[in-house]
Amino acid sequence: MAGRSMQAARCPTDELSLTNCAVVNEKDFQSGQHVIVRTSPNHRYTFTLKTHPSVVPGSIAFSLPQRKWAGLSIGQEIEVSLYTFDKAKQCIGTMTIEIDFLQKKSIDSNPYDTDKMAAEFIQQFNNQAFSVGQQLVFSFNEKLFGLLVKDIEAMDPSILKGEPATGKRQKIEVGLVVGNSQVAFEKAENSSLNLIGKAKTKENRQSIINPDWNFEKMGIGGLDKEFSDIFRRAFASRVFPPEIVEQMGCKHVKGILLYGPPGCGKTLLARQIGKMLNAREPKVVNGPEILNKYVGESEANIRKLFADAEEEQRRLGANSGLHIIIFDEIDAICKQRGSMAGSTGVHDTVVNQLLSKIDGVEQLNNILVIGMTNRPDLIDEALLRPGRLEVKMEIGLPDEKGRLQILHIHTARMRGHQLLSADVDIKELAMETKNFSGAELEGLVRAAQSTAMNRHIKASTKVEVDMEKAESLQVTRGDFLASLENDIKPAFGTNQEDYASYIMNGIIKWGDPVTRVLDDGELLVQQTKNSDRTPLVSVLLEGPPHSGKTALAAKIAEESNFPFIKICSPDKMIGFSETAKCQAMKKIFDDAYKSQLSCVVVDDIERLLDYVPIGPRFSNLVLQALLVLLKKAPPQGRKLLIIGTTSRKDVLQEMEMLNAFSTTIHVPNIATGEQLLEALELLGNFKDKERTTIAQQVKGKKVWIGIKKLLMLIEMSLQMDPEYRVRKFLALLREEGASPLDFD
């Protein structure tokens, strides 16, 4: 039928505004009819009608959202004509609606169930016309929401005929809501509305993981396993849409503790996690920065760190973005409560504040706290429970594969600019740098670069660079090896100077007893390397004083080629209190546990224990500490060889320490004249004629002297004139009680 001219008016009541209907006088149209409103030849809008007596005949009243959508003004002349829906093609199957609070003042973070919303929507607007782009007001749970129709799909015609669905869906611009229509709600952009339930669209979520990162670009090497474990525990749940996480009843991990030796990449890893994630920049805080001299300020600093996350969670609920807070040196502020001296309790209240913020009464589900320390033993245990810093990840010394990755990263730029010589084999360097941390490998590359640069500096009165040669600057294999030899030593490696002084005269194999000790030592080394059943192997070298026990222990350790070798010797603990000794020993063993293969030589055990026979007196505190350390197995995947030395086996027997060692090897003195002559020949200090004279005196006779004492007597004799050397040597042997008294 032809359209009729009518005048646009304002909707008479608020209740009628919520019906989404255009309101007319019953003399013009009937309730439930549908009309097309033409505002211009090219603009037409479909409405469902409702009658009300207060509307003047010839007028049609619209709510504010309807007038905005159609671009109508009060009193505007419009053309209105009846419209009939083709129910075979225009019944709405699914409709996507964007929703937000109508008034921003009335926002809250309460969850709104979209399933109940959809049922209420169908009930309120059944048999009404809807168009794509239409705006309307929707009342639900005494709250007003602004709706915008985003998309409409027609119902499958087969369903209308009572046949099985064919799956055919057609997009339409205008449709009629029926009882079987499906409504999906979609939260408006930047809205704080918290939608739950199944009747909501899957949001186009930005992936939490940055798509263009890789380990090499991030400058992280040797941490592949650690990173994958962190991802599995801390980020996997955050990759999934909130609705799936909600259905599983899953809570995100809120905290990670990274611990390990200095220089192994804890801070680097935490710093790069922020770059890996499509999240806001992480807040990086050094532990001591939190502390403040004013009362209550330290706790306020903690609260400030979490303020943004709390505000956003209140506003956006489950759709809040991720807030990352990184604590470097977290042990500075999270020490065990009650462990600090003094009565102020400042540290304790800071710990309490942090505990309550991470997982307290008002739980935050949009934070990730990353703590870093090389002293995890100092941290309050309440911070380490699940719900707080529950993912504990050791960032240890890199293995050979990890060292290769790290060296590749630090030499990549040189390689790209052809400044790395062709003779540099990164694999060789990775093999040679056992127990180097990431920072030490970076230092090695830096030292090699400095060595190469130094070659091109002119040695004159002024410091000048030879620019001609500088053009051909190359960092060579020799530069790396020189830096490895002279400049960079690993903190958790083998310092040759530690044990070189113990074997500066070499090992004098004066007889089968010495060979047997070395062979047994080699067997124990192989057992430590190869056996999975005995990760801890300990041996006690016992024998009389000056028999060379320490030298043999140092030799066995050196020949093992273990990446970590340390000597725990009383000469490094002179003047230490008992507690300080225990701490020093514990540190050596703790460092050993960080290496894949380690050897610790515990030298002169009775001296470590402060043993003296008068009394007798010894330190029970050190004894108990040593017993525990000798029996404590290293962490899984680590192996430890302990070599102890003592001159008082009987004393250790009484102290029940012998049982702490896996085995005991006896190191004897030189006991026969033949062994003495063998030692003299190997040392080569006396001439053949002199040795013949000595042989006449000692051959076939019993002697008793330690190799260390023998060396001292020989050196003393050599200070005499040549004709008196032999006589002096024999006299010294007699005075030491090392030989029979019938020497001439």
From Swiss-Prot:
One CC-aspect GO term: Golgi stack
Pfam assignment, any one: AAA
Catalytic reaction annotation: ATP + H2O = ADP + phosphate + H(+)
Main localization, broad class: cytoplasm
Residues given in the record as Mg(2+) binding sites: T550
List of residues that carry Phosphotyrosine: Y259
Post-translational modification summary for this protein: Phosphorylation at Ser-569 interferes with homohexamerization.
SMART domains in the cross-refs: AAA (SM00382), CDC48_2 (SM01072), CDC48_N (SM01073)
Coiled coil: none
Superkingdom: Eukaryota
Cofactor(s) the record lists: Mg(2+)
GO annotation (BP), single: intra-Golgi vesicle-mediated transport
Cofactor remark: Binds 1 Mg(2+) ion per subunit.
Cell compartments where the protein resides: Cytoplasm
Enzyme Commission no: 3.6.4.6
PROSITE patterns assigned: AAA
SUPFAM superfamilies per the UniProt record, alphabetical: ADC-like, Cdc48 domain 2-like, P-loop containing nucleoside triphosphate hydrolases
PANTHER family named among the record's database cross-references: VESICLE-FUSING ATPASE, VESICULAR-FUSION PROTEIN NSF
UniProt family annotation: Belongs to the AAA ATPase family.
Subunit structure comment from the entry: Homohexamer. Interacts with GABARAP and GABARAPL2. Interacts with GRIA2. Interacts with PLK2, leading to disrupt the interaction with GRIA2. Interacts with MUSK; may regulate MUSK endocytosis and activity. Interacts with CDK16.
Stated name of the protein: Vesicle-fusing ATPase
Organism this protein belongs to: Pongo abelii (Sumatran orangutan)
